[in-house]
Structures are given as C-alpha cells and as structure tokens.
Regions:
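Post-signal peptide N-terminal segment of mature Sec-exported envelope proteins
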Residues: 29-51
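Bacterial lipoprotein signal-peptidase II cleavage site
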Residues: 22-29
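Short, low-complexity, Pro/Ser/Thr/Gly-rich segments in the mature regions of secreted, periplasmic
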Residues: 165-177
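Cysteine-clustered segments with highest specificity for TGF-beta superfamily mature ligands
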Residues: 114-168
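Short, surface-exposed beta-strand/strand-loop-strand elements in extracellular ectodomains
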Residues: 79-98
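A short beta-strand element within beta-rich, extracytoplasmic domains
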Residues: 62-79, 168
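Sec-dependent bacterial lipoprotein signal peptides
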Residues: 1-21
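Acidic Ser/Thr/Pro-rich low-complexity disordered segments
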Residues: 93-115
C-alpha cells in the first residue's frame, strides 16, 4: 500500500506540474491495488479509519481537486449481505478531533466527517464502477498536498469476514486551478 501511494503521489505530482503548465485537468492512470480487512460490519453511524494515515511525498505543485474512478471488485465470506458503505476522507489527526481510539483504528461520528463517495452496495464477487472524491474532491487534494490522508468507510448494512477490495483501472483526474 505504501509503494502504491508513493507511486501515485509521484504520478500526481507530475500530473499537477503538467496541468499547471497547460491550465487543463489531467488524467493519470494508477496501478491496480487491493485492500484486505479481516471483518466488516455495520458501523452504526460511525466512520472507521485506519490507525495510521497513508503517507507519501508532497507534490511539487499544490493540486486543487482530485477524483479517483475505476472498478472495484469485492470478495468476502458473507455473514449478512450485501455490504452497503460510503467512503470518507480526512486530513486532520483523528486523535485531535474527538474520535475514539479503537486500538487498530479510529472511530469517528459520521455527522462530523467528509464523504468522498455516494453509497455503494457490494454483493460478493461483484465488480462495479466507483468514484472517490465525488463529492468533495478538495479533501483528497488537501491530503495529497499535506502528504498524508486517512480514508475510511461507514458501513450502513451487511457484515462479512475475509473482505478484499480489488481496485482496477483506477484513474486520477487532477486539477490545479
């Protein structure tokens, strides 16, 4: 994951520099990646973030907005299907923002968090188009500009174990103005 974020940050930095020269949005393809978690369940109005922020090199030119789009295939052992979730992002340290330290993760009240997607419903083995940074593309940009970001999820329905999210054909659309 760190290698992917480092590579993505470098590509986004290059994209931002090129977009600054052309004053046009730039589209950058990203490498495929996967995220695996042991278990997922209804978070009851809470957003769960990883304990540590994703960290990467800051771009040479600040970016204004970033939208990520592509395909996601979710595989899991269902306890209760489907998994229904919304993705969120934050740049402020959850520990300084009134979130609860749950050991391996931070738990924050969804009402105070910033969504970066609509709601998605994932059946086991299903592939679907997703967009992160719509709404609120500036949150992803702020994270890239600061060199760290937490990306989490609120699960509103479903429960599963052995969950893997395979992100493929991902593209970053970057604007600097």
């Amino acid at each position: 994951m760190k290698t992917l974020l480092r590579t993505s940050a470098l590509l986004l930095a290059l994209a931002a520099a090129l977009a600054a020269c052309s004053k046009a949005p730039l589209t950058v393809p990203l490498e495929d990646f996967s995220i695996s978690v042991d278990a997922v369940g209804n978070t009851a109005g809470q957003v769960v973030y990883p304990k540590n922020a994703a960290q990467f090199d800051r771009p040479v030119v600040d970016v204004k907005t970033i939208r990520l789009s592509g395909q996601v295939t979710v595989s899991y052992t269902a306890v209760q299907a489907p998994l229904v979730m919304t993705f969120y992002a934050r740049t402020a340290d959850p520990g300084a923002a009134g979130c609860t330290d749950a050991g391996l993760a931070w738990i924050c009240d969804a009402a105070g968090e910033t969504p970066i997607s609509g709601e998605y419903s994932f059946a086991n083995g299903e592939t679907q188009q997703v967009t992160l940074g719509d709404p609120n593309p500036e949150v992803l940009a702020d994270g890239i500009n600061q060199g760290r970001i937490w990306i989490g999820a609120e699960v509103t329905s479903g429960a599963a174990t052995g969950v893997t999210f395979d992100f493929t054909q991902m593209v970053a659309e970057v604007t600097v103005f």
